[in-house]
């Protein structure tokens, strides 16, 4: 089982009092599923909350993680004799049509797929379970 987490703190103005609102935004893998979470707390008033869910992160979280940590590129490590295991993994993990999975497989075979480190580690693990070797490379923010 893969354990990967990534987070970032961001500040904004509290809607309740105008104070400084500190939010911890994150993405993680739990029990082989992609998850995201937000914890927020105002430094001046009792306004606080926590929200988490399974699945792809909302764009606000993705963009904050990419801006802070940069991107991770996932590629197939070798030219596959058959893309069937790659297509199966992509269809299962991302609920893609066969055509969409083929486009994603072409991307993985070529320049690679880019996302957060957690997203790419999750996909790499799904491919590994189908005996597909991959490489991950990080690019700084």
Language model features: what each stretch is:
Residues 1-7, 12, 20:
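Structure-specific DNA junction-binding interface
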Residues 10, 18-19, 23-141:
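Short, amphipathic alpha-helical interaction segments embedded in low-complexity terminal/linker regions
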């Amino acid at each position: 089982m893969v354990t990967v987490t990534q987070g970032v703190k961001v500040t904004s103005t509290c809607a309740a009092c105008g104070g400084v609102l500190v939010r911890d935004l994150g993405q993680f893998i739990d029990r082989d599923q992609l998850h995201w979470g937000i914890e927020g707390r105002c430094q001046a008033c009792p306004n606080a909350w926590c929200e988490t869910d399974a699945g792809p992160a909302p764009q606000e979280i993705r963009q904050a993680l990419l801006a802070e940590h940069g991107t991770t590129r996932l590629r197939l490590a070798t030219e596959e004799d058959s893309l069937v295991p790659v297509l199966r993994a992509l269809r299962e993990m991302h609920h893609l049509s066969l055509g969409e999975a083929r486009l994603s497989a072409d991307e993985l075979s070529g320049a690679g797929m880019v996302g957060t480190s957690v997203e790419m580690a999750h996909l790499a693990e799904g491919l590994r379970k189908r005996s597909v070797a991959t490489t991950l490379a990080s690019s700084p923010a």
